[in-house]
């Protein structure tokens, strides 16, 4: 953000040029507020609505990563997964990752939707969608976002096996 | 000072609760907090690693804790 709304309205000199510049900046601000969507939800994620949201006439391509619940870990049958999040911090950390993606690549819209609660095999815990004018940026940013999310965002999953439950990655 | 510590994932099971209260000295650091917690809950030391968050940000061992800070134990994350 370049300046706040308060500064914007307290300007005392209005010229045509400054007004055009200010409208440009304001447009950028509004754009900044709508080029990112982050959601933590206990409800089923909607893949199509995520794709629709990142699509724009300026985009040349969209990259989507869809995580799915796998039926086994190291050969052992997984019955279901239970996701828990430290919600305010998870959202803050996801916002940081998205900002890093915008800083690193010329991407246009970025979306992260992540589930909480119990998911059955085949259900979708995470969707990442990125649009860009050219595919390299979309591929690279999408990969970066899911890889970083797995390292920094405070969300945990517990795998349910037939002989008990295990928090993933908790123990060496 | 008395502080509350939030626990998530496996830490919640180790504490037996999603919230524990601790008494710390006024200039206590993250390092001091971890030491105290590991004395009371030795199973914490068996984790692959764990971080402490203060007011929704990852904290460093030397960071000082203040009264009314929101403290959380962050065991290894596994989202996605």
Which residue stretches match the model-derived regions?
Chain B
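Ubiquitin-like/PB1-type beta-grasp interaction modules and other compact soluble beta-rich domains
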Residues: 1-78
